Amino acid sequence: MALGLKCFRMVHPTFRNYLAASIRPVSEVTLKTVHERQHGHRQYMAYSAVPVRHFATKKAKAKGKGQSQTRVNINAALVEDIINLEEVNEEMKSVIEALKDNFNKTLNIRTSPGSLDKIAVVTADGKLALNQISQISMKSPQLILVNMASFPECTAAAIKAIRESGMNLNPEVEGTLIRVPIPQVTREHREMLVKLAKQNTNKAKDSLRKVRTNSMNKLKKSKDTVSEDTIRLIEKQISQMADDTVAELDRHLAVKTKELLG
């Protein structure tokens, strides 16, 4: 207790007054910067309010068993010279948006011309979207036409890309015109789309892991100039952001699965 009071007195008066006036649960951690030079290390001290124990009900205890209930909320501006957390957050959000876009454009019960637009076709100039090298139109509710007259040399590659798109399509070719019959909506077709949705979600999680790994690697580059406690706190923030993003990806998958299965 005496040691605690001594440490409390050592805190800058501004922070001490703030702490005395603002008693909050220890779970609400705010990063405050105190610029000190100790052995060449910058110290980013994390000050939390006086700990208050919250007595949970049995139900709440059971729900939280085995899970860490402490969350951090670092002010990105205070650590921007170490890592740009706002940029990391935007990269994680882009993973979610890419999955949502994929779901909306390629995973629909009824195949539409728009579903074929972004199919990647391997050409001599690299991968191009199908709508960049063709004209796609709906001839009837049961048939989509893909006109390859502008890039006839890419016809075979376009057929291959459509067939391997995972949308259960079997294109037929007549010269430079590709006919794409729209499959009937069967239970098997619905389940196939759900399987594809899960695969795309797993790919999104792979992309998210890359964002997290790259962020952690950037953070480690500062270990010689920033305290270990600060590094660990920022690592926890990044992991927390990644976990929240995974939960969001799973939520979108659940919604899409329900939509596809009817």
Curated annotation (Swiss-Prot):
Keywords, in A-Z order: Mitochondrion, Protein biosynthesis, Transit peptide
Keyword Mitochondrion: yes
Cellular location(s): Mitochondrion
GO BP field: ribosome disassembly; translation
Keyword presence, Transit peptide: yes
Transit peptide residue numbers: 1-55
Stored InterPro entries: Ribosome_recyc_fac (IPR002661), Ribosome_recyc_fac_dom (IPR023584), RRF_sf (IPR036191)
One MF annotation (Gene Ontology) recorded for this entry: ribosomal large subunit binding
GO CC field: mitochondrial matrix; mitochondrion
Function: Responsible for the disassembly of ribosomes from messenger RNA at the termination of mitochondrial protein biosynthesis. Acts in collaboration with GFM2. Promotes mitochondrial ribosome recycling by dissolution of intersubunit contacts.
Family matches, as PANTHER family: RIBOSOME RECYCLING FACTOR, RIBOSOME-RECYCLING FACTOR, MITOCHONDRIAL
Family, similarity comment: Belongs to the RRF family.
Protein name: Ribosome-recycling factor, mitochondrial
Species of origin: Homo sapiens (Human)
Gene that encodes it: MRRF
